[in-house]
């Protein structure tokens, strides 16, 4: 089983309570950091929608998956799992069972607790705990009910450099890394251990056993996309060459009108930027967006574009009819082969997408990438005549 209930040899499973030692460690920590509650780990790598997005997923079911299990554990057992109240939370292989569902509660800032994490199976908070016959071996457990103290149930989520992953830091369980240095105080973070168990350790950057992917099971439905045209970049693409042959059988110069028609293939891709929080966005096939066009070196939306771009990172190919009319001077009694070169452009346009689940709204950033044939009326093609 992936969730262990109380056993006789280990004793009773109980939640961590505040001790004089923990009080002293916390006092030293706060003094060391000028009375800040803790060192803030958030930095410039955290996207500007993280706070609003994580608030939007509050109390929605999430799965919590460790990036890499510890040596001595089953590789497929990477999801937090527990099937009831007052039980140990361990690692299981299911991402769909009720036991692998959890949800976040966000308390007011005045509470001093950033997050509570609840088990959907027990509807009680996760907390630091231990078995009475092994008090030094702290584990993760679900509270027996909702009537007790939340002292050991407070958590903070510290974003990893791996987008979507977090260190899950206890707000109550402190330690001292060097017994000879009373100021070497730290907050423990959750860590995957051997035998599919969970324990705690001092946080180490990039340690895969300390990083957990928190993913809402709900899919947010795309509502709209707003392009940041001012910060778009445009580069030249490969020209499209079309050859037209004409003859003049007369003994004098003539001017010939000609029209070149063809269908070009344009492309569209929406690439989401990996955010601090991983969310799933679905886009119905009925929702389509206009594509920015290249005009005078800028990406623009004139308002008359057809809505034909679907929200997908897969390359969408679109047919673009091109028509170009011009006149050319024909020398007497000649064959003309006219090469007309049409300009193309590659556009990279930042965007913000808004998606909803019920009344919950999340936002993500991304880049739309498009390959576009220039309008020949606005970007004149190059004509290269060859007379024979």
Residue ranges and their predicted role:
Residues 7-224:
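Lectin-like carbohydrate-binding module/patch detector with strong preference for beta-trefoil
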Residues 279-299:
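Short hydrophobic membrane-inserting alpha-helices and related fusion/pore-forming segments
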